Amino acid sequence: MISRLTGKLVEKNPPQIVIDVNGVGYEADVSMQTFYNLPPVGESVQLFTQLIIREDAHLLFGFATAEERKTFRQLIKVGGIGAKTALGILSAMTADELARAVAEEDVKRLSSAPGIGKKTAERMVLELRGKLVAHTVTDGLFAASPAADETEDIVSTLLALGYNEREAKAAVKGVPKGTDVGEGVRLALKNLLK
C-alpha cells in the first residue's frame, strides 16, 4: 500500500495532481480542500494517500492530513458511497464539519454535498455515528497559493463538485473580495448549504 508521498508537485488539474517522487510520477485525486492548499507547481509537497485497487484500475487519492484520510476511509465503508463520492463530500466540507454534521444528525447539511441524497445522508448518520471525531482544524501542511482570478477559480471548483453554473455564481456573490481561493470555496459552499 502507498501510505504517503513526498516529492515535487509537477501537475495540478483539479481534482488531479501529479507528484514526482525520485523520477516516478504518481497521479492522485485530491479533495478541493486539499487542492487549494497545495503549493505552486515545482515545489515540494507531502500527501497522505489511500490506494484503491479495482479490477480495471489502481486509484490513488491524496489528502493534506492524516485526519482527512481517516475520514475518507470511514466514508467509503458506508453503503452507497464510493471513492469519488467520498472525495466530493470532503471537497464540500472539512473532516471536522462532516464529523459535526454526523454528530448533530444534520441530514440537510449532509445531503447538500454533491451526490448525496436524503437516504444516503441518513445512512451516513447511522453508520458513522461515533466513528468520526471533530478536532480543531489547523492550516494543514501547505501554504495557500493565491490565484490570479479567485472568483473564476471558486466557480470552477463548484462546477467540478457538481453544482450548476447558476448556483455557483450565486454562491460566489456572498464571498468577500480578496478572499483566497481555498477559503472562498469554503464560504461559497456554506452559502449553498443555507
Curated annotation (Swiss-Prot):
The RuvA-RuvB-RuvC complex processes Holliday junction (HJ) DNA during genetic recombination and DNA repair, while the RuvA-RuvB complex plays an important role in the rescue of blocked DNA replication forks via replication fork reversal (RFR). RuvA specifically binds to HJ cruciform DNA, conferring on it an open structure. The RuvB hexamer acts as an ATP-dependent pump, pulling dsDNA into and through the RuvAB complex. HJ branch migration allows RuvC to scan DNA until it finds its consensus sequence, where it cleaves and resolves the cruciform DNA. One of its GO terms (molecular function) is ATP binding. Residues 144-147 are annotated as: Flexible linker. Has three domains with a flexible linker between the domains II and III and assumes an 'L' shape. Domain III is highly mobile and contacts RuvB. GO terms for cellular component: cytoplasm; Holliday junction helicase complex; Holliday junction resolvase complex. Residues 1-64 are annotated as: Domain I. This is Holliday junction branch migration complex subunit RuvA. The keyword Secreted does not apply. Disulfide bonds: none annotated. Residues 65-143 are annotated as: Domain II. It is found in: Cytoplasm. The keyword DNA-binding applies. Belongs to the RuvA family. Residues 147-194 are annotated as: Domain III. Homotetramer. Forms an RuvA(8)-RuvB(12)-Holliday junction (HJ) complex. HJ DNA is sandwiched between 2 RuvA tetramers; dsDNA enters through RuvA and exits via RuvB. An RuvB hexamer assembles on each DNA strand where it exits the tetramer. Each RuvB hexamer is contacted by two RuvA subunits (via domain III) on 2 adjacent RuvB subunits; this complex drives branch migration. In the full resolvosome a probable DNA-RuvA(4)-RuvB(12)-RuvC(2) complex forms which resolves the HJ. Pfam families: HHH_5, RuvA_C, RuvA_N. Keywords: Cytoplasm, DNA damage, DNA recombination, DNA repair, DNA-binding. Gene3D superfamilies: 5' to 3' exonuclease, C-terminal subdomain, DNA helicase RuvA subunit, C-terminal domain, Nucleic acid-binding proteins. It comes from the Bacteria.
